[in-house]
Amino acid sequence: SIRSLPLQPDGEARWRLPAGEYWGQFRIEESLMLRCEAGAVINAEGEGNALTIAAPNVTVQGCTLTNWGSNLTKLNAAVFIQREASHAKVQANRMQGPASGIWVDGTSNVSLLDNVIEGELRLRSQDRGNGIHLYAVHGARVIGNRVRHARDGIYIDTSNGNSLEGNQLEDLRYGIHYMFSNDNRVIGNLTRRTRTGYALMQSRKLTVIGNRSEQDQNYGILMNYITYSTLRDNLVTEVRDGGAGEGMISGSEGKALFIYNSLFNRIEHNRFERSALGIHLTAGSEDNLISDNAFINNRQQVKYVASRRQEWSVAGRGNYWSDYLGWDRNNDGLGEVAYEPNDNVDRLLWRYPQVRLLMNSPGIEVLRWAQRAFPIIKSPGVQDSYPLMQPPAIAPHPQENPS
């Protein structure tokens, strides 16, 4: 029990843990606030959970937690929040260890604020726990945390009505990973050097606004079976080709945005830049509204694999394409000629990459001319009828200069 520690009273139901190293695993079974002094360290001796919260209305603040157990099957964590521990607050703690940093199990209205979580580099990525793991959780606030070298930064499973804001997630498998979770808000987060920045899967009604993905591999934002969701004011830059890797959908070659079997989403005012591929849309992804985005200096702007034509403009406004070669005669900010990023020649290049060696040859130019002159041979693809002549501004990110 937490009562075995030399706690000092700090007010009604408030306790202070003096500086020092304390060995063992501890449970909190009553509503209280635990505040650790600088230099107070709880070392779990490589076993179980460092702290288990098993009562409602508990606050844990300012503690350093280390060396908890590495058994992922037993859900070992630095802080394990049980079902009965609603309204828990875990704030401004530091955690370094092998399994999950904070595991929240089937409770509601928890607040995880400003924690620093560091995984165990000596372990393979798949053998580490997640920085923060929510399972069957409702009403959680996950704000201002920093996670490095865990498996996934924040993993949300079967959890509805939660908010993830202003978290910084670096050197991970997935930065933010959603599975079977609805009505969640993902606002102003930063991922960097992950193998997928935002892995959004099998969920609906996600609000994904003002996030950044920098130097991630494989995917910046991956949407897999996502419906009725909004992506707005996100910046994805420098997504690199890291190979397929573990758990990746085939064909993960540096895609800023990958949309797989996702419908009825609104994707607007985002910027996808300097990546191997700007946007890849496939597998029945239809009825999405895609407008006012900027696709800037991607090696390939669009890959679209489907049998139906898609229009990527809304109410007379399309997207900005840095490789658009049209003109604006009436100065209304819109190109006079539609942007068609993937014609039959592009499809040929996708199927036979070696043909790229002939990209600027007279033969390729003849093929493109024939396609324009005889549109009857034109395959279904993407068309932006109102391409923008200038990239739209996106809202500033709260972590423009993260430390």
Regions found by a protein language model. Give the residues of each.
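Acidic Gly/Asp/Thr-rich repetitive segments characteristic of extracellular carbohydrate-active
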Residues: S1-R27
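Acidic glycine-/aspartate-rich tracts in secreted/extracellular proteins
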Residues: G20-E21, G39-A40, Y324-W327
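Extracellular beta-strand-rich solenoid/capping regions of secreted or surface-exposed proteins
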Residues: Y22-R35, I42-S86, S100-T107, L134
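Short "repeat-start/strand-capping" segments in structured domains, especially the N-termini
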Residues: E29-L32, P56-N57, S86, T107-V110, ...
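Generic detector of contiguous secondary-structure segments
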Residues: N43-V58, H87-L112, G210-R232, S275-F295, ...
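Functionally critical loop-and-helix segments that line ligand-binding/catalytic clefts
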Residues: D114, L235-Y260, N265-H269, E273-S403
